[in-house]
Regions:
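Active-site-proximal loop/helix segments of hydrolase catalytic cores
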Residues: 152-223, 234, 238-240
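Metallo-beta-lactamase
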Residues: 2-153, 175-180, 199-203, 236, ...
Length: 287
């Protein structure tokens, strides 16, 4: 296994001193000597309330904002000012902003770039130089970013590139947030265990170039996430077909915005699909 980005990384001023609220991410914590599940404070529990806000606005403590930028790219922001962009393509909008972390998958050019912004401190590729894959465990204090390797179909034939892609997991503010990437197969038992309990999952719902709809629904049932954020949908009704299939098991919220702000305390009681509308970042406008 090719290991990268392990240990403490550079972070914006103040974040190194911001402790990370432990998540209950790892499903096998009970089997690891000395490991414990995080306990919620008294009175904590899932609530249906979550609020929307513009990307890059200041965040209250223990809140995380997820903004849908385009295709499979989301901006994840923390109260301490850390940020990560998933499936980074080199363009996130008409802005000079750059994230602290960029993750990439190599399924297509719409999921990665060979020329990332050199100002980004941590660019995490979801693939390694060999079939052994890559291992990321980037600890920025307030946020931990790690990956679980998955296989990928070749873009040129029917062969399979073992460990050629990754599911990225972001542990922040007590939440476990997963980005399934360009997923081509259902995870096996070991991969599910490595992912752990995802509170929030970003899932490709095109039903064609990634998993077909029945298999993606099986994955989401297995993950049992509180919030599902659909991504990677195209014209022709792929989003509508997913929403129709999910509506029997999930509450559906059509936000009409590109951002949602969540906390461990505000997770919905019933598993919920939150449909965000993609929108690139823009430079702040003068008042």
């Amino acid at each position: 296994m090719h290991a990268q980005a392990t240990g403490q990384g550079a972070a914006p001023e103040g974040n190194a001193r911001t402790p990370r609220v432990p998540s209950h991410c790892i499903a096998l914590a009970g089997d690891i000597p000395g490991a414990r599940f995080a306990a919620l404070p008294a009175g904590a529990g899932p609530r249906t309330a979550s609020r929307r806000a513009r990307a890059r606005d200041p965040l209250p403590e223990e809140m995380v904002r997820l903004s849908y930028l385009a295709h499979a790219s989301f901006l994840i922001e923390t109260p301490g000012g850390l940020s990560a962009v998933t499936d980074y393509t080199g363009f996130i909008g008409a802005t000079d902003f750059f994230p602290d972390v960029a993750t990439m998958n190599r399924a297509h050019e719409t999921h990665w770039t060979a020329m990332p912004d050199p100002r980004i401190p941590h660019v995490l590729k979801g693939w390694g130089p060999t079939a052994e894959g890559v291992e990321h465990r980037l600890d920025l204090g307030e946020m931990l970013v790690r990956n679980v390797n998955t296989d990928i179909r070749s873009a040129f034939d029917e062969t399979v590139d073992r460990n050629g892609n990754s599911i990225f997991v972001f542990e922040v503010a007590g939440l476990c947030i997963g980005h399934l990437g360009h997923l081509h197969h259902e995870p096996d038992a070991a991969q599910y265990a490595a992912l752990g309990r995802l509170d929030v999952v970003m899932a490709a719902v095109d039903g064609g170039t990634t998993l077909d709809l029945p298999r993606m629904m099986r994955v989401l049932r297995r993950l049992r996430s509180s919030v599902v954020l659909p991504m990677h949908w195209f014209r022709g009704g792929s989003l509508e077909r997913f929403v129709a299939a999910a509506s029997a098991e999930f509450d559906i919220r059509q936000e009409g915005e590109n951002s949602v702000t969540l906390s461990l305390r505000s997770l919905p009681r019933r598993p919920t699909v939150i449909v965000l509308r993609p929108n690139y970042l823009r430079a702040p406008q003068p008042d």
